[in-house]
Amino acid sequence: MSDSSHNLLYNKFELPESVKMSPVEGAVGGIDKVARFVADPLEKGMGHTLGSALRRALLIGLEAPAIVSFSMTGVLHEYMAVEGIIEDVTNIVLNLKGSLLKKYPLQDCEGGRCSQKLRATISIDASDLAAAGGQKEVTLGDLLQEGTFEAVNPEHVIFTVTRPMQLEVMLRVAFGRGYSPSERIVLEERGMNEIVLDAAFSPVVLVNYFVEDTRVGQDTDFDRLVLQVETDGRVAPKEAVAFATQILSKHFSVFEKMDEKRIVFEEAISVEKENKDDILHKLVLGINEIELSVRSTNCLSNANIETIGELVIMPEPRLLQFRNFGKKSLCEIKNKLKEMKLELGMDLSQFGVGLDNVKEKMKWYAEKIRLSKNTKG
C-alpha cells in the first residue's frame, strides 16, 4: 500500500461521463453485429491513443468458440466423397469453417480451458427426402443436439443428403484467439478419422475509428473518439468493446506496478455539484473585488473583463491572446479561481450564459441578487 506522501497531484483530465452507443444505418444484422461508439470530451491526442489501442485489442485479443475438428460416419479423410452426399469432404470442411457458435456463460474445465465434443445423430428417411424435393439439407442447427453452445447461424448448410441414411457426426469445439491453422491445433485423444480444421476464433470482423474536434464550454481544443465495430455475432459489439477494455487494463496494470507513486487527479469543477446561488454570487463579483496583482488586474481591465463570470467563461488559450497577458498572470488567476472553487473555461450554459451575452447576463444577475437582498432586508 503506497503512502499518501508518495501521491502526485495532476491537473484534471476531461473525461466522458459515459460512452454513447448507436446503431449504424443500413448495417446488416443490426446493433447486435454493428455499432458505433462515441466518447467525448477527451484531452487532445487521447482520441488517437485510445482509438488505436482499442482497435488492436479488438482485432487480436478477443476469444470465441470455433469448430476445430470433426468426424462423420464413412469419412476417412478430407480428400474423398461420401455416397449419398452432394458435397465432397473438402466442401464439408469449408462449410464447417463458416459455422458460428457462442456459449454463455463461459465454463472452464478442470486445469484450464479445454475442447468439447458435440455429438449428433442424423437420420434421414425416404419421407424426409420426399418432403425436401429429393435433397435434404443438413444445417448447423441440426448438428447441435447437445451441449450448451448456440448457433449464431443455425440455417447454415453443412451438407446435402440425396438418399436415406443415418450418420453419426462429432464436432469438437474449442476456444481461442485470432486465427489458428490446422497444423497448430493440438487435440487431446484425437480419433483415428478425426479431421482437424483451420479455426477462426476472432469474433471481430472490422474496426474503424476516427477523431473529431469537440468543445468543453467555449474551448474547442478537445477530441471526440468515434469507434465503429462489426462482429460476426458470436460476441455483440458492446461486449467486444468492454472485453477489449478489460484486456488493455490487465496489460497496463503490469506497468503501473513499476513505481509506488500514485497520481491524484484534480476533479473537474461541476456547477451542478455546487449550490447555484453560491456560484452566481461569485460570478457577479467584480475583478477588483478579488485579490489580484495590479498587473493581472490591469491586463483583465484592458481586455474589458469586468466580472468573475466574464473571466471563468474564457478558455485558457484565449486569455493568453490578450495583450501583455503572460503565463505569470495566468498562473495567478488560476490559483485565485481555484480558491473560489472555480476554473477557466467553465460551461455556464445552465445559467443561460455564453460568450456572446456574458456581460449582459452578469449585470442582470447582479441586479437580481441586489433586489433579492433588499427584499429580504
Curated annotation (Swiss-Prot):
What does its UniProt record remark on the domains? Answer: The N-terminal domain is essential for RNAP assembly and basal transcription, whereas the C-terminal domain is involved in interaction with transcriptional regulators and with upstream promoter elements.
The entry's protein name is DNA-directed RNA polymerase subunit alpha
One term of GO molecular function: protein dimerization activity
Region ranges (Alpha C-terminal domain (alpha-CTD))? 276-377
Q: Which family does it belong to?
A: Belongs to the RNA polymerase alpha chain family.
Keyword hit for Transferase: yes
Can you supply one Gene Ontology CC term for this chain's record?
DNA-directed RNA polymerase complex
Which Pfam families did the record assign? RNA_pol_A_bac, RNA_pol_A_CTD, RNA_pol_L
Q: What is its EC number?
A: 2.7.7.6
Keyword Protease belongs to the record: no
User: Which reaction(s) does the protein catalyse, per the Swiss-Prot or TrEMBL entry?
Assistant: RNA(n) + a ribonucleoside 5'-triphosphate = RNA(n+1) + diphosphate
Q: In which domain of life is the source organism classified?
A: Bacteria
Q: How does it assemble?
A: Homodimer. The RNAP catalytic core consists of 2 alpha, 1 beta, 1 beta' and 1 omega subunit. When a sigma factor is associated with the core the holoenzyme is formed, which can initiate transcription.
Query: Where is coiled-coil annotated?
Result: none
Q: Which organism is it from?
A: Chlamydia trachomatis serovar A (strain ATCC VR-571B / DSM 19440 / HAR-13)
Q: What does this protein do?
A: DNA-dependent RNA polymerase catalyzes the transcription of DNA into RNA using the four ribonucleoside triphosphates as substrates.
Region: Alpha N-terminal domain (alpha-NTD); residue ranges are 1-259
Query: Keyword annotations for this protein?
Result: DNA-directed RNA polymerase, Nucleotidyltransferase, Transcription, Transferase
Q: Which GO terms describe its biological process?
A: DNA-templated transcription
